[in-house]
């Protein structure tokens, strides 16, 4: 094979590897965030108290469930 074909194959393989790696990394990050959200009830409690609110446990849990529901909806919307 000529040198030009080898260079072309190398560029194509590099492009496929980069795009494949980006796709796989994106899916892994979405899965990780979906399973283990970064925002916890303790963090919500801290944010509400910093804003001057005195949240009840029910309000914290409601906010947490809404955040989880929205993140799952965003992930499922992205899969369509």
Swiss-Prot record:
Subcellular location, record wording: Cell membrane
Keyword Membrane among UniProt keywords: yes
Membrane is among the record's keywords: yes
Membrane-spanning intervals of the chain: 4-24
Principal location listed in the UniProt entry: membrane
Tree of life domain: Bacteria
One Pfam family from the record: UPF0154
Keywords: Cell membrane, Membrane, Transmembrane, Transmembrane helix
Designated name of the protein: UPF0154 protein SpyM51556
Upper lineage: Bacteria, Bacillati, Bacillota, Bacilli, Lactobacillales
């Amino acid at each position: 094979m000529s040198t030009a074909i080898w260079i072309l194959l190398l560029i194509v393989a590099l492009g496929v590897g980069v795009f494949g790696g980006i796709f796989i990394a994106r899916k892994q990050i979405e899965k990780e965030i979906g399973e283990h959200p970064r925002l916890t009830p303790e963090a919500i409690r801290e944010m509400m108290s910093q804003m001057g609110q005195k949240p009840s446990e029910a309000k914290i849990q409601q906010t947490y469930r809404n955040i989880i529901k929205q993140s799952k909806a965003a992930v499922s919307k992205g899969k369509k």
